[in-house]
């Protein structure tokens, strides 16, 4: 997911996306444990997407504090 797409979403959409990414990460980790042939970089990409979403949410929260 691109950072431009993340920044264009509202806070509620980002929180929903964060929940979905968390579920997706759990499923990916479990599938990786069961099936060794899955793409190992997929989990890393999900973690990076989660970090991007959290970064945008924290930036917005800090911005609201200063205003």
Swiss-Prot record:
What the entry lists under CDD domains is as follows:
Ribosomal_L29_HIP
Q: Look up the signal peptide feature and give its range.
A: none
Which InterPro entries does this entry report, sorted A to Z? Ribosomal_protein_uL29 (IPR050063), Ribosomal_uL29 (IPR001854), Ribosomal_uL29_sf (IPR036049)
**GO cellular component assignments:** cytosolic large ribosomal subunit
The answer, when asked if Ribonucleoprotein is one of the entry's keywords, is: yes
Task: Tell me which Gene Ontology terms the entry assigns under biological process.
Answer: translation
Per its record, what are the GO molecular function terms? structural constituent of ribosome
Pfam families this protein is in? Ribosomal_L29
- Tell whether Ribosomal protein is among the UniProt keywords: yes
**UniProt KW keywords:** Ribonucleoprotein, Ribosomal protein
Q: Which family does it belong to?
A: Belongs to the universal ribosomal protein uL29 family.
List the NCBIfam families.
L29
User: Protein name, please?
Assistant: Large ribosomal subunit protein uL29
Q: Give the originating organism.
A: Ehrlichia chaffeensis (strain ATCC CRL-10679 / Arkansas)
* Gene coding for it: rpmC
């Amino acid at each position: 997911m691109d950072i431009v797409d993340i920044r264009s979403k509202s806070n509620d959409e980002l929180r929903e996306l964060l929940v979905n990414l968390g579920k997706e990460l759990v499923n990916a980790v479990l599938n990786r444990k069961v099936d060794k042939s899955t793409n190992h970089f997929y989990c890393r990409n999900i973690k990076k997407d989660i970090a991007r979403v959290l970064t945008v949410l924290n930036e917005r929260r800090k911005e609201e504090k200063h205003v």
